[in-house]
Amino acid sequence: MNRLAIGTAQFGMDYGIGSSPGKVSISEVKKILEYAQSTNIDMLDTASAYGKSEKTLGELNVDEFKVVTKTRHFTNLKINDDDLNALNHDFNKSLRDLKLDSVYGLLIHNADDLMKPGASKIIEFIQNLKKTKKIKKIGVSIYENKHL
């Protein structure tokens, strides 16, 4: 087991400083994934927010990888039922696009979402995904020390 993960944002959209060379072609993604497997890199970091990244991965059969995806950024000041419906929709779309029945992990993409009123609804939803074996691991993306 290797402790590295492949970030897949550029598999689905122009991403990064200057975004050169831009979105990676599907043939190049296939080569990257094959090389990753040959070197025992078995984890992929993706998100529905990464353009067509999840769809691209689904086209290439990522059953052998531990796939970690992320929630959307919630824009409301308080987490409400519409947010939970969107979370459910997004997660199921991720599974469809990835052509998987479950993923290894789900990260809350914005730690600030956990500080909002109603955040316990997000946590309950994600814990239910774990209970129903749709995910194995739960986590959060951290961008600032204050979130630790």
Identify the role of each PLM range.
Residues 1-66:
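N-terminal binding-site loop/beta-alpha segment at the start of enzyme catalytic domains
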Residues 7-16, 45-53, 78-85, 105, ...:
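Short, mixed-charge, low-aromatic patches
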Residues 8-10, 23, 31-37, 71-73, ...:
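Generic detector of short, locally flexible boundary/turn motifs and exposed helical patches
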Residues 9-11, 47-49, 70-74, 108-111, ...:
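Active-site beta-loop-alpha junctions enriched in small/polar residues
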Residues 14-27, 71-88, 109-117:
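Active-site mouth loops of central-metabolism enzymes
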Residues 21, 25-26, 56, 77, ...:
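Solvent-exposed, non-transmembrane amphipathic alpha-helical segments
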Residues 54-72, 124-135:
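Alpha-helix-loop-beta-strand connector modules within alpha/beta enzyme cores
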Residues 81-148:
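Glycine/proline-rich, positively charged
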